[in-house]
């Protein structure tokens, strides 16, 4: 189940702004444990799928996995041994622009040790530094 947009308005996009911290998606919303990015990177649809498979195979039945990132940006590439100019290359693959602080995956329904081991397996599949975080319950005064 590769994550690819079904329909896009334009085939090619400008490169995204990669500076700063993640403004949204920095708290665990659905699960009990999650993976938080500590560095910035492009995560491809193949890497997202590889991390998902690694987690679900380790958790097996009983647990639930949420994917909070979506590769919605095409990265283009020119063919090898092509002269400069003559326009932008064709879309090669889809990426998600990840900034520090972003919660990428969440897990619930399993024990703490099993969840942390599954999340560590997913972290090893990703091209960035990340850590495992636990859900924090906030009351209205804490927000």
UniProtKB/Swiss-Prot annotation:
HAMAP family in the cross-refs: Ribosomal_uL16
Keyword tRNA-binding included in the entry's annotation: yes
Pfam families membership: Ribosomal_L16 (PF00252)
Protein name: Large ribosomal subunit protein uL16
Keywords for the protein's UniProt record, in alphabetical order: Ribonucleoprotein, Ribosomal protein, RNA-binding, rRNA-binding, tRNA-binding
Job of this protein: Binds 23S rRNA and is also seen to make contacts with the A and possibly P site tRNAs.
Subunit record text: Part of the 50S ribosomal subunit.
GO molecular function per UniProt: rRNA binding; structural constituent of ribosome; tRNA binding
Top-level taxonomic group: Bacteria
PROSITE patterns hit by this protein: RIBOSOMAL_L16_1, RIBOSOMAL_L16_2
Family: Belongs to the universal ribosomal protein uL16 family.
